[in-house]
Structure formats: structure tokens, C-alpha cells
């Protein structure tokens, strides 16, 4: 479906089937606050916070079955702090630590 660029206010984009695809706010033509993406079946895909048009805050992704896929923080469009990754059964796979977008530590969890 056609989308229009907003300078201020709520932005909503839709799939052809009418399901909401993306929703979030613009302020002075920049993304701000919480933005959410869904897949075509209406399942939440990801959620991120923006500040002045840049990713800034917690970002969470989900597997198609609704289990968390990964979660971490951004600061000014860069991965920062602890990021956790899960498999589609909800078991933690790994964690990573970033500082201003650079990987500092990565750890894989043992599988039994």
C-alpha cells in the first residue's frame, strides 16, 4: 500500500491484506519514541525506541512463534551494552556486550 511521509504525528503503514505493518511517531520529520513492526499475520516482529531519528533505547525482535529472538540497547544508532539472543524455543543461545557499536565480549551458552 502507498505510504506518505509525515513531518509530525502518528505514522501507520499497512500490508496489502490490511494488517498493520509499522506504527510509530515522527517529530520534525524524524522518528521518535516507540516504533513497532508486525508480520503479515499480525504477530509482533520488532519494537525499537528512537530519539531524534536515531535508534536509541531497547530493541526487541521476536521469532514467528512469538518467542523472543534478540534484545539489546542502542545509543545513537549503535549497539551498546548487553544483547541477548534466544532460539525459537525460548532458550538463550548467546549474549554479547557492545560499546558504541563495537563488540567487546561474546559468549555462547552450552547446549545439552
Stretches with model-predicted labels:
Residues 1-112:
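Glycine/tyrosine- and acidic-biased, solvent-exposed loop/turn segments at the edges of beta-strands
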Amino acid at each position: 500500500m502507498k505510504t506518505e511521509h509525515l513531518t509530525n504525528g502518528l505514522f501507520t503503514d499497512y500490508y496489502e491484506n490490511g494488517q498493520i505493518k509499522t506504527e510509530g511517531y515522527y517529530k520534525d520529520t524524524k522518528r521518535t519514541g516507540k516504533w513497532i513492526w508486525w508480520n503479515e499475520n499480525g504477530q509482533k516482529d520488532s519494537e525499537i525506541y528512537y530519539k531524534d531519528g536515531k535508534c536509541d533505547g531497547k530493541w526487541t525482535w521476536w521469532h514467528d512463534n512469538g518467542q523472543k529472538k534478540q534484545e539489546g540497547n542502542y545509543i545513537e544508532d549503535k549497539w551498546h551494552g548487553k544483547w541477548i539472543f534466544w532460539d525459537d524455543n525460548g532458550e538463550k543461545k548467546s549474549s554479547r556486550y557492545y560499546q558504541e557499536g563495537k563488540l567487546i565480549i561474546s559468549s555462547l551458552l552450552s547446549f545439552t
